[in-house]
Amino acid sequence: MTGENLIRVDNGGDQTRFPWLGTYQLSRLENQLLLDGLRHFQVFTDGQFPKDVARQSLLAQIAADKSIAQAAPGLNRLIEKVRADLVDGIYVTNLPTEKSITYLLSLTLSSSIGSVFNYGSPNSGRLVMEVASDPSEDQRAELDWRTEGAWVPRDRRTEWIGLLGVENTPGSYTAYAPIKPVEQTLSSHAKAWLYSPSASFHSPHSPASDAMTWSAPRAILSRSPLGHTEIAWPGDAVRAARRDDAIGAGALAELSSEIDQQHVRVSIDAGCFLAFNNLRGVHRQATASDGYCLCYKTYARHSLRALQVKGESGPIFSLAEASASRRDPADFQHPHAAKGKPEYRIHA
């Protein structure tokens, strides 16, 4: 990893290397106009962020429709590119940092991208999740590359993840790599293996010794209904579905190497917002050894229809129902998946 992979808060760095990433820095006037607009909407809730998630969602939708376009037309145009699937991520800086509107700002930005939602467990029914490093615990310098909800069927998995910075120590960052440019550089044999149902994923909530919690043979790479290259990667253990597989280790090593070449890393400081497509790329986080990082995380989808099919209106949905598979073989537990210790992981 080199400095060329870093996009700075001032929008520095070689951004021409990352045409899939849209960036925008609010002017001082746009910052103030957006702050005033969000304050105005919280007047209707006695100046406080509503506790009811349905009211939170409604307030954020109204604020997204009204405040962003009026306060920062350039940012609104960038978000339209997100909604049209023209970019895989956006990095926005110089946003308001006033504590009283931070939750609303987080939801407003994500609501401008899609419908904000969450799963009822293990996130305690909150739309805005606090992601913080714990200085009292030993931490890994970098987490593995991953997609979130890899075990959740595609039409119920989060499409977009939003991260709004609240506090951040220098040296901490989030990295993202879209899979399309990575896939284009892979060798034909690696690509064939990754697109074929050759891997098994282990459930993140089950012990490694439990063979029944390995998925059926599934592909790591796939094509969306619109033809986009997509990836599912749980960040936990993965192994070949067949014990005699001789290609998988090399294919995954090649994939990991190309991700390291194609990714971008950004510092999510206070007033910075990163949103990225969870279906079309992988991400990871790294915290400085003596640092602290706090950001607000949100999930969004273009449509919640598949999540609502069981009768739940949302925006909080049962994780058990969302994870329940219909006919997608990638989500079935498979008693005949190869036994043994995990063989493959993608590392930085």
Regions found by a protein language model. Name each.
Residues M1-K66, D85-I90, S124-A270, F276, ...:
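Active-site environment of non-heme Fe oxygenases that use a 2-His-1-carboxylate facial triad
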Residues A69-V116:
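N-terminal functional module of multi-domain proteins
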Residues K99-R140:
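A gly/proline- and charged-residue-enriched helix-loop-helix capping module
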